[in-house]
């Protein structure tokens, strides 16, 4: 199991939480909505050849801006901060390690695709400490931190509300130290608790 895919799935869950598990969303003159989220989950997986349970908690806040003028009011920019703490336990042995991360995500101004009134291109920037993985003694074993930039083509559906459908995405660039970005997560699990 590749690390980047598992991390992206957790981050996507946080994004969904931002839109569905909000606590007292509010808005000011330039915002569609803003709020906070706080959620926990537990899951057991066996992709590494034995049962590993992840107990996790993430919190964050988000702001969705009102539709931007350059897109005819159709694109709503998201800014989000997420913090995650998790413990991974080998169910057979009780051995465990912890992982934490904190990221800041922001969508840059979007541009309408020529000839369209709902399809936009947008870049996203995400920065932070992507992973700090510690063994059971608390020693840092892996750490990833830096910046990621992606470019997306997105159909807003022309309904003047946040959301829509992704059409394509392209990785643009990265900077920083990425010990875990494309690592074999099961190799890390085996090393620390296998």
Predicted regions, residues:
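Secretory targeting and sorting signals
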Residues: 1-29
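Beta-strand-enriched cores of mature, soluble protein domains
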Residues: 30-194
